[in-house]
Amino acid sequence: MYKYKVIMTGGGTAGHVTPNLALVPALKENGFEVKYIGSKDGIEKEIIKNNNIPYFQISSGKLRRYFDLKNFSDPFKVLKGIKDANKILKKEKPDVVFSKGGFVAVPVVIAAHLRKIPVVAHESDMTPGLANKLSAPFCSKLCVTFRESLKYIKDNKGVLTGSPIRTEILNGSKEKGLEICNFNKSKEVILIMGGSLGSKIINDEIRGNLELLLKDFNIIHICGKGNLDNNLLDKVGYKQFEYVSEELPDLMSAADYIISRAGANSIFEFLALRKPMLLIPLSKKASRGDQILNANSFKNEGYALVLNEEELINSTLYNKILELKSNKKNIINAMNNMNGKNSIDLIIEVILKSIKEY
């Protein structure tokens, strides 16, 4: 018998979904029944259903910071999304809503507020994303990953919890990861991740440097859907994937180094695994600059090296990887000196407290 019911929401990219999954086992241990509201065709639908969590879909418009003709029609989708979410919440009667952000979350948060249901949100990046900015007035508490984020949260709603780490990420097998890729143990392994949607510029630069890199390293390349290079399918020492789910813990365990974008959820997982990382944040041209702030924070802590997209030319990339290799010991030492509490436990505490105080 469940004590509580939580409806989770968040979507658009994997980064708005995987932290929710990290919380699910602990929520269930604390007596929560867990259900999910997402969009009709977002990445969250497949991820959540694959984890056997009841899923409700709503209409949702995209939140854009740039001009697009769809900006005129999407507000009506958001209004319909509020109506859809309200209908679901009326039927399900959750004790609390937990939001991880993304454009699908806004209608759910507003509907929960209208129904007087407490809302706890979580922001992974240093500065709140647009969805969480819009949601903040309707939230009881907004959990943050970086201490620097608290200054952006009004009305004493901010709580420093850190980023929830999926338990399965910590339990990967190095041997299994090497076996999946058919790698021998004679070379160190670099894992390249361009985010859940892939990154053309990172893909192109890695492949442009491939012959040089394969002299010293084996390469695992998660390149994004539709981005496989058929000419390299049989390349010895190079294993490419469009997207991985179940194999990810083993592939991460097999890696000695990680080259990645700088989304907060991912880099905190790398930190938990003590993996030296070269971060290539999304440029300000393609984002609001949050990944640049995340990456520089990790650089200042000694956890990572940073290479901006503008510097991403062949010689610079290869030299930066060699610099990462030479700094491996120092980076791991900095990571081992980190003081961190269990983020999942802290977030569960905030959720339970919000239910009792609302």
Swiss-Prot record:
Topology versus the membrane: Peripheral membrane protein
Annotated transmembrane regions: none
Location relative to the cell: Cell membrane
Enzyme class per UniProt: transferase
Binding, UDP-N-acetyl-alpha-D-glucosamine: T13, A14, G15, R166, S196, Q291
Domain of life per record: Bacteria
Record keywords: Cell cycle, Cell division, Cell membrane, Cell shape, Cell wall biogenesis/degradation, Glycosyltransferase, Membrane, Peptidoglycan synthesis, Transferase
Reaction catalysed by this enzyme: di-trans,octa-cis-undecaprenyl diphospho-N-acetyl-alpha-D-muramoyl-L-alanyl-D-glutamyl-meso-2,6-diaminopimeloyl-D-alanyl-D-alanine + UDP-N-acetyl-alpha-D-glucosamine = di-trans,octa-cis-undecaprenyl diphospho-[N-acetyl-alpha-D-glucosaminyl-(1->4)]-N-acetyl-alpha-D-muramoyl-L-alanyl-D-glutamyl-meso-2,6-diaminopimeloyl-D-alanyl-D-alanine + UDP + H(+)
Gene3D superfamilies: Glycogen Phosphorylase B (3.40.50.2000)
Database matches in SUPFAM superfamilies: UDP-Glycosyltransferase/glycogen phosphorylase
Pathways per UniProt: Cell wall biogenesis; peptidoglycan biosynthesis
Family: Belongs to the glycosyltransferase 28 family. MurG subfamily.
Protein name: UDP-N-acetylglucosamine--N-acetylmuramyl-(pentapeptide) pyrophosphoryl-undecaprenol N-acetylglucosamine transferase
